[in-house]
Amino acid sequence: MIVTDSWIFVHNPKAGGASVEKALGEPLKSGHLHSPLSAIQKGGRAAFGFVRNPWDRMLSLYAYQCQKPQPPKSPAYQQLIRDNGFKWWLMEDEYFIEGWTPGLEPIQRRSQMWWLEGCDFIGRFENLRLSFSWICGLYGIKERPLPHINASSHAHYSTYYDDESRAFVAEHFAPEIELIGYQFEEG
C-alpha cells in the first residue's frame, strides 16, 4: 500500500502490485504492504487497486510459492506443495480446511474485494499498463515505466484445472468474478 496526501494505492497480492509500487515509489514501512483499504482512514483521498482473474491468480500464487519461498515458508513446505501439485495445494491445503472462520482466511486466499472495498477505481491486471497510465493521468501522478516484478513461470492457467478445482475457485472468489465479469478461459 502506498499512501500520499491525495491518493492511496491498495496492493492486492498477485495482481501486479509489486510492479505498480516500484513505478510509484516505496510502500509504507509500517506493516501496510498488503493491508485492505479499510485498515486506514481514507480521509477524502482517491483510492485505487487492481484485480486479477482468480483462476490465473491462484495458479500464479502457487507457482510463485513453488519457485520463490517466502518467509515464513519453509523449504519443507515448498517441497510439499511441489510434490502434491496445484490441485492439492488449492483444495486440500491447510488454508481451506472445513470450518475455517470466514474473514480469517490466510491473507493471500481472501477475495480480492476484501482489500479493494471502497476503492474509487479498480483496474484489471489483464490491462495493467493501460489502467496504470489512465490512473496516472487521472490523479496527476508522474508516469514511470511499469516493470514486471515477481513474475512466476507456468503454462496458461486453464491447463492446471479440472472441473472440480475450477468450481472451487468460482465458489471462493465469487465476489470478484461477479463484479468484474471474469470467466474461466481456455488457453
How should these model regions be labeled?
Residues 1-187:
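Membrane-interface amphipathic segments in extracytoplasmic regions
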